């Protein structure tokens, strides 16, 4: 496969086959492309728009080469991850939701990275909370078995992620790697809550998950109260577009905050802080269940709605509203905050 030929095809707006995309990702992972070539490729793909076949091929290659976390066959794990790069840049909702869901009994294998375009990614917030994020596959599996949660730092498990990280930072805009991160769980999670930065990705990404063998999933994009695309999370300030995947069938629905059992909140309260320390304060307030101000209540409610979806996907509750109620009870009992403290202590001693 010649790089020049592939680039000419992409710039002529010809879509790649799944196999071509697979082989192209192998070239990246094998170090056959320089930084300038990678930057040109990512830019051209972003301008053309990536297809389901292309994303599937890229993800399949990354999954094949990933350092695997060997999960016991009897354990059903759930992954909670967003693409990042959303317009609003909300605080670390999916990470808070993962902790709450794990405290409620869901086995959560969270796969993530540092922030690329924002101030604080999932890896950044967990590290700030005291978690050792650089665990290998055996230690991650031990964390999952002992605590019910593990964090897998993407660059340690994916050569491609580490290879393109400097290029992505320099480019500064969303690329296919924003989409690929949540699709390439080293734990091969068959259940997933995946937030996307653009509502037009909801259906295609659900198709990719199906192609990759995921059994049950929700792909979500949240809007603000004026129907503007806003966040790669379930929204509590406006509608959420959801792609439900179950039994190889995909259904697209629009849900409102009451469908998740929460009140309509205020968008301005969900915005990420400008520093890691500021985000950490928000994050810990949520896990502690603080809701004594409008801002704290809004941040807690969105975490509960997203945690509730994880509980629902894990089939611990029959409805999304029931999942949110279970998440609320978990936080009110103090279990979420205790798990966060245990997670930090456990991983530092591995």
Curated annotation (Swiss-Prot):
Keywords: Amino-acid biosynthesis, Aromatic amino acid biosynthesis, Glycosyltransferase, Magnesium, Metal-binding, Transferase, Tryptophan biosynthesis. The lineage of its organism: Archaea, Methanobacteriati, Methanobacteriota, Methanomada group, Methanobacteria. This is Anthranilate phosphoribosyltransferase. Pfam families: Glycos_trans_3N, Glycos_transf_3. 5-phospho-alpha-D-ribose 1-diphosphate binds at residues 82, 85-86, 90, 92-95, 110-118, 122. It catalyses: N-(5-phospho-beta-D-ribosyl)anthranilate + diphosphate = 5-phospho-alpha-D-ribose 1-diphosphate + anthranilate. Its cofactor is Mg(2+). Binds 2 magnesium ions per monomer. Its EC number is 2.4.2.18. PANTHER family: ANTHRANILATE PHOSPHORIBOSYLTRANSFERASE. One of its GO terms (biological process) is L-tryptophan biosynthetic process. Anthranilate 1 binds at residues 82, 113. Mg(2+) 2 binds at residues 232-233. GO terms for molecular function: anthranilate phosphoribosyltransferase activity; magnesium ion binding. Pathway: Amino-acid biosynthesis; L-tryptophan biosynthesis; L-tryptophan from chorismate: step 2/5.
């Amino acid at each position: 496969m010649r790089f020049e030929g592939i680039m000419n095809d992409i710039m002529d707006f010809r879509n790649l086959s799944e196999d071509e995309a697979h082989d192209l990702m192998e070239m990246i992972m094998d170090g056959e492309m320089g930084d300038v070539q990678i930057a040109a490729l990512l830019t051209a793909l972003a301008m053309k728009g990536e297809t389901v076949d292309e994303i599937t091929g890229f993800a399949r290659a990354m999954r094949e080469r990933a350092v695997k976390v060997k999960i016991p066959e009897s354990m059903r794990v759930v992954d909670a991850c967003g693409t990042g790069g959303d317009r609003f840049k909300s605080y670390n909702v999916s990470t808070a939701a993962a902790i709450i869901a794990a405290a409620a009994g869901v086995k959560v294998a969270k796969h993530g990275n540092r922030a690329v375009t924002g101030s604080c990614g999932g890896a950044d917030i967990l590290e700030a909370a005291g978690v050792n994020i650089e665990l290998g596959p055996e230690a991650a599996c031990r964390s999952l078995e002992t605590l019910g949660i593990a964090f897998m730092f993407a660059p340690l498990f994916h050569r491609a992620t580490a290879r393109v990280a400097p290029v992505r930072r320099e480019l500064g805009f969303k690329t296919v790697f924003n989409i690929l991160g949540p699709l390439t769980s080293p734990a091969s999670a068959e259940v997933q809550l995946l937030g996307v930065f653009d509502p037009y990705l909801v259906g295609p990404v659900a198709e990719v998950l199906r192609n990759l063998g995921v059994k049950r999933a929700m792909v979500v994009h949240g809007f603000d109260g004026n129907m503007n695309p806003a966040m790669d999370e379930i929204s509590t300030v406006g509608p959420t577009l959801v792609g439900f995947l179950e039994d190889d069938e995909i259904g697209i629905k629009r849900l409102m905050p009451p469908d998740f059992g929460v009140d309509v909140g205020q968008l301005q309260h969900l915005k990420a802080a400008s520093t890691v320390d500021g985000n950490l304060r928000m994050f810990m307030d949520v896990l502690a269940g603080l809701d004594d101000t409008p801002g704290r209540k809004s941040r807690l409610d969105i975490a509960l709605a997203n945690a509730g979806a994880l509980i629902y996907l894990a089939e611990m509750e029959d409805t999304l509203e029931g999942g949110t109620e279970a998440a609320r009870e978990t936080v009110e009992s103090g279990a979420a905050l205790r798990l966060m403290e245990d997670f930090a202590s456990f991983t530092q001693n591995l």
